[in-house]
Amino acid sequence: MNIFKNLCIGIGVLCLASCASRTPVAQEMELTQYVHPNIGTVHSRWFFYTPAAVPFGMAKLGASTNGTYGNEQGWEAVGYDETHTSIDGFPCMHEFQIGGILLMPTVGTVKNIPGKLETPDEGYRSRFDKKDEYATPGYYSVLLKDYQVKVELTATERVGFQRYTFPKSDSSHVIMDIGNKLGESGNVRDAYIKQVDESTIEGYVVTEPEYVKKYQAGATVPMYFYAKLSQSPNSVNVLFRGKDLMEKTEIKGAGAMMVLNYDTSKDQVIDLKIGLSYTSIENAKLNLEKEAENLSFDEAKALAKEKWNDALNRIVVSGGTEESRIKFYTGLYHALLGRGLASDVNGAYPKNDGSIGQIKLKQDGTPEYNHYNTDAIWGGYWNLTNLWAIAYPEYYNDWVQSQVIMYKDGKLPKLAY
């Protein structure tokens, strides 16, 4: 009852915030310059470091230094650590208890395990130098030293973009490690990956996070993807982690992986667009088509920067030192990053019982609101709900609607996965 009372109070705050007039800013400031995503990344949580994302997005991309280790209890520090010197891949999804769709470009002999930080040569991970790494809201890049491959990441709300610039090699690869434990996602219960045609890969992974085991035994979290390649691979292999390569284009089961093989020229660029969804492969495809079918990497990068500047300019501070502005806007950036979309462009969303719900559509065919399912009312403990209501009322409206629809579906969450 107290939770429901707090929710009603929140709705009242929303009404006040929505009715409040906002004085338009004549010209937006370039506030992304004050956001330093690498601050606080030593011993940080899985969902903390996702520079290649837009505010409140589903697609949250970043580098992982030990995400493939998994997470024994569901809350330990894992993912990206500023003190680490090698990278084990670039996941597309980072949320509380959710991690999936890891990609890694390599050159040379294919290795079928990620390897450890202490012994990077045993796996497909690569060393990197901090001087070759760059992170800003909406974009990330790094040079993988062991392969001399430059990796760039950006995103729209539901689509991840990965760009690889390869050296000249007749043994360039893109490893898609789909069916293995990643970050806080827990053990994999099922996975599937298939080459649909020369330029399309699709699949899913179903995980059982540790917190789900504790609080809703038997439930699982599925993640679906639909990826388009800018260039077709010369050949494709599949395998289960640690096993020999097989000359097939489809594989199912925990541990499933796919390797795309290329013969690359010097500075050859290969782009991937990865549509994401919590409901189905079909909706992952639809999300890609609606948000990014005709969008280039550079266009997506520019749009992401614009979205971040728009969001950060909701609160403009003056005076103080540059260090203080960096602290403020980096904190605001994290307040807008960690609560992600769960619904698709057509209004489909994952219900607590494992079925698929449908948000009512407006006359133009778009959903009446977006569904968000991360952290739920925990945000109230950190005063995030007040921040959203005052500065981001359109998001707060969707957030409240998300809590209400979960209540109507049978739960009013303290946490939602």
PLM features: residue spans?
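C-terminal motif of bacterial Sec signal peptides marking the signal peptidase cleavage site
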Residues: 17-18
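Bacterial N-terminal signal peptides that target proteins for export
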Residues: 1-9
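Accessory carbohydrate-recognition regions in carbohydrate-active enzymes
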Residues: 24-417
